[in-house]
């Protein structure tokens, strides 16, 4: 049994929150769930939990905010569907943000422990009873989509055309095969372990995509080595082989997953880790170019902010003594929303912030106005195999900085710089 599923004595309270699949998960094998608009939930792995609780202050801006621990239970409805429900956990030192104070989407419905009864499960209304009603409504909507995804999940790269006139964000949640796959696998693992226990500890983390209307997400596996010091010989050999057969060995980074909305063509593009492993260095560069391309032209205004954040992160990691971030990923996130176009003959003050798009790229009479489009995020995630001399129980203590991870960051900086220079910036 994996560390995330070891028996733990946890005591659920009287109220719980129904956890939903996190639709913007593009990589990793651990299931990530949506707790509320700004908070995600994933199985607690002791080493990752330890990392977040002892995180160096200067690294905090490059990792999701840690919000605490919850107890998660599951119920099976009459159709044998499993639903995961989170309960508050007494005694955790993290701060659980139970009320969404974000003003990014003030009109959105928020899940709380004590309000919104259509989302909160109270003791007098059994979870099973509530779940049956909820599932019955959702089943009719999702049945056809599930049938369509049987073949989509087998594809390493897929495109899906969306209705550009509709709400792209709402359509996006239906078409992420990797998210569906991880959610189904998580439920199956919990079902198989049901005889042993029905309660698990999950950690709560900041939802990095919550401030973006149409999140474009790139998941990069960083470093030249992926296996932890505690890996078995078989596991280590398997991870070494994956690195040797991918760009990890050559440039210290490989694509682990990608989700891009190309507003110009009205397509969603998904790429999974299996395709990422097959990419050559040139293929990796092309994938990065594709990530920053909206189907009509390159989003050049994103490249400068990305380079700045990568350089800042590199400087921070160069100061971290004895840390090794084995199998950790780096997320790059920006908004793929198509912003309104502004006519070139508009008033001067309207043109003040226009991007420098040429006439042929912007269909002649218009230039593209990326309002807030340069807002891009770069964060480290997944620390289940991180090690440091602060973790006294580790049998291996490393010296100096994580050269493999830093090498991958420098490669990334070089490639994004190359894309920027080739595009004429």
Curated annotation (Swiss-Prot):
Annotated TM spans: none
SUPFAM superfamilies linked: SAICAR synthase-like
Tissue expression notes: Detected in kidney, intestine, liver and heart.
Binding locations of ATP: 206-208, 219, 382
Residue sites binding substrate per the record: 215-223, 235-242, 385
Pathway: Phospholipid metabolism; phosphatidylinositol metabolism
GO molecular function annotation: ATP binding; flavonoid binding; inositol hexakisphosphate 5-kinase activity
Compartments it resides in: Nucleus
Key word Transport present: no
Superkingdom in the source lineage: Eukaryota
Homology family: Belongs to the inositol phosphokinase (IPK) family.
Entry protein name: Inositol hexakisphosphate kinase 2
Species the sequence originates in: Oryctolagus cuniculus
């Amino acid at each position: 049994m994996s560390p995330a599923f070891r028996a733990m004595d946890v005591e659920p309270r009287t109220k719980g929150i129904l956890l939903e699949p996190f639709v913007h998960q593009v990589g990793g094998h651990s299931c990530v769930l949506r707790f509320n608009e700004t908070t995600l939930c994933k199985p607690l792995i002791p080493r990752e939990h330890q990392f977040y609780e002892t995180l160096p202050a200067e690294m905090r801006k490059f990792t999701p905010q840690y919000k605490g621990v919850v107890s998660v239970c599951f119920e099976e409805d009459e159709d044998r569907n499993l639903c995961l429900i989170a309960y508050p956990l007494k005694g955790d030192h993290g701060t659980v943000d139970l009320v969404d104070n974000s003003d990014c989407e003030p009109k959105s419905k928020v899940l709380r422990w004590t309000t919104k009864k259509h989302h909160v499960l109270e003791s007098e209304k059994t979870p099973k009873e509530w779940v049956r009603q909820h599932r019955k409504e959702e089943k009719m909507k999702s049945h056809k989509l599930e049938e369509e995804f049987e073949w989509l999940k087998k594809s390493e790269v897929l495109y899906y055309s969306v209705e550009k006139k509709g709400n792209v964000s709402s359509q996006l949640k239906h078409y992420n095969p990797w998210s569906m796959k991880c959610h189904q696998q998580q439920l199956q693992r919990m079902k198989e372990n049901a005889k042993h226990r029905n309660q698990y500890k999950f950690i709560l983390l900041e939802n990095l995509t919550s401030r973006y209307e149409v999140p474009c997400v790139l998941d990069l596996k960083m470093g030249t080595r992926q296996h932890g010091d505690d890996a078995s010989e078989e596991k280590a050999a398997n991870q070494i082989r994956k690195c040797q057969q991918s760009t990890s060995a050559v440039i210290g980074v490989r694509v682990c997953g990608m989700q891009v909305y190309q507003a110009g063509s009205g397509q969603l593009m998904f790429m999974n880790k299996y395709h990422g492993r097959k990419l050559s260095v040139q293929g990796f560069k092309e994938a990065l170019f594709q990530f920053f391309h909206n189907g009509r032209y390159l989003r050049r205004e994103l490249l400068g902010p990305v380079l700045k954040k990568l350089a800042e992160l590199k400087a921070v990691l160069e100061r971290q003594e004895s840390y090794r971030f084995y199998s950790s990923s780096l997320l790059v996130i920006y908004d793929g929303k198509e912003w309104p176009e502004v006519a070139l003959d508009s008033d001067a003050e309207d043109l003040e912030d226009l991007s420098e798009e040429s006439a042929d790229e912007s269909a002649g009479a218009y230039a593209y106005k990326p309002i807030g489009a340069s807002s891009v995020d770069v964060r480290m995630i997944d620390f289940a195999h991180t090690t440091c001399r602060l973790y006294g129980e580790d049998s291996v203590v490393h010296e100096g900085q994580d050269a493999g991870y830093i090498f991958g960051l420098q490669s990334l900086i070089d490639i994004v710089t190359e894309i920027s220079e080739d595009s004429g910036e």
